[in-house]
């Protein structure tokens, strides 16, 4: 049986993660979660950095597989450039490249990655606030400062 402290922590984490996901949906809506919709990547949303991230992903996706991993061969030809330098989240890019090739057409993961970031920030923010505030409502209210 779980003790009260671990049950409270789990509850705070999941409620904070839901709060983070809700904030994501309020800020960006559902459009970024459509992997076939890259309009928000090309047009930039709030900030313009995502255009660089998406361009790096597009170059990497079109590159042939080889060693070292995560090299976009179309940039800095003929040597290529690591997608880490384009901030295209190399681990996610490497894992999703085979999926993107199977799906074909437009494929972006930036929206889902951002949703996961919001949820994790909300969850861990609630846990951090829970260290200093009693109950469940007060840490979740403080969690709004994190997401």
Regions found by a protein language model. Give the residues of each.
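Membrane-embedded helix bundles of polyisoprenyl
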Residues: 115-147
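Start-transfer (signal-anchor) and selected internal transmembrane alpha helices
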Residues: 1-36
């Amino acid at each position: 049986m779980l003790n009260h402290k671990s049950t409270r922590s789990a509850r705070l984490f999941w409620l904070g993660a839901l709060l983070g996901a809700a904030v994501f949906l309020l800020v960006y809506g559902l459009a970024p979660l459509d992997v076939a919709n890259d309009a928000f990547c090309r047009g930039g949303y709030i900030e313009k950095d995502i255009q660089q991230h998406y361009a790096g992903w597009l170059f990497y996706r079109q590159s042939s597989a080889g060693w070292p991993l995560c090299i976009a061969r179309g940039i800095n030809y003929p040597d290529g450039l690591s997608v880490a330098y384009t901030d295209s989240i190399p681990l996610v890019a490497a894992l999703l490249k085979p999926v993107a090739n199977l799906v074909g057409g437009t494929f972006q993961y930036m929206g889902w990655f951002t949703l996961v970031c919001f949820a994790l920030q909300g969850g861990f923010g609630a846990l951090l606030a829970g260290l200093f505030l009693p109950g469940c409502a007060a840490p979740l209210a403080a969690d709004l400062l994190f997401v």
